[in-house]
């Protein structure tokens, strides 16, 4: 099967949002999806909060990746955080996931970025095996991820 990874354009927003909803369903998190396509487009294409990639085959979007830039104070250099990577079920195990990572690794190389990081749900064994097969190391043994959102974030603002 032939496919192409490319940077997303504003014309891709509806299909990206559809794929995000598919990912949320797969991850059993559909109830957490609250965005509108307009908000999503504004965040990616106007506010530059993140960047998007699309994988196409025969003119049809079959996967996407969302990433943003990070910074390591210890290295004094930037990196990429991969927020989402998703390939439609019927197109998995055909090299698309690896192609997304290769595309992102090339961005890292071209821009002298020293890290490519992401997280994965602990029950997602197929993805864990895939990531480890590429040489990725599990960081959760040394680091914990924390989040403030919603009411707790608002409380902090109002302290």
Where in the sequence are the language-model features?
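Conserved GNAT acetyl-CoA-binding A-motif
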Residues: 109-119
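Conserved GNAT-fold acetyl-CoA-binding loop/helix
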Residues: 17-43
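A short helix-loop-beta-strand connector motif used in the catalytic cores of GNAT acetyltransferases and
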Residues: 42-54
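Conserved beta-hairpin
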Residues: 51-63
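A conserved beta-strand-loop-helix scaffold within acyl/acetyltransferase catalytic domains
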Residues: 67-74
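Conserved N-terminal entry element of GNAT/NAT acetyltransferase domains
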Residues: 1-11, 153-159
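Conserved active-site alpha-helix within GNAT-family acetyltransferase domains
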Residues: 98, 122-141
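Conserved acetyl-CoA-binding loop-helix of GNAT-fold acetyltransferases
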Residues: 93-106
């Amino acid at each position: 099967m032939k496919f192409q990874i490319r940077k997303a354009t504003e014309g891709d927003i509806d299909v990206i949002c559809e794929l995000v909803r598919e990912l949320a369903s797969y991850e059993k998190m559909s109830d957490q999806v609250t965005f509108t396509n307009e908000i999503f487009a504004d965040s990616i294409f106007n506010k530059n909060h993140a960047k998007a990639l699309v994988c196409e085959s025969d003119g049809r979007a079959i996967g996407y990746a969302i990433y943003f830039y990070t910074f390591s104070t210890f290295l004094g250099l930037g990196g990429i955080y991969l927020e989402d990577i998703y390939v439609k079920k019927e197109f998995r195990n055909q090299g698309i996931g690896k192609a997304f990572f290769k595309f992102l690794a090339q961005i890292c190389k071209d821009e002298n970025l020293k890290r490519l990081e992401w997280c994965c749900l602990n029950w997602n064994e197929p993805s864990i095996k895939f990531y480890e097969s590429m040489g990725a190391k599990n960081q959760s043994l040394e680091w914990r991820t924390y989040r403030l959102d919603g009411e707790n974030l608002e409380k902090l603002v109002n302290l």
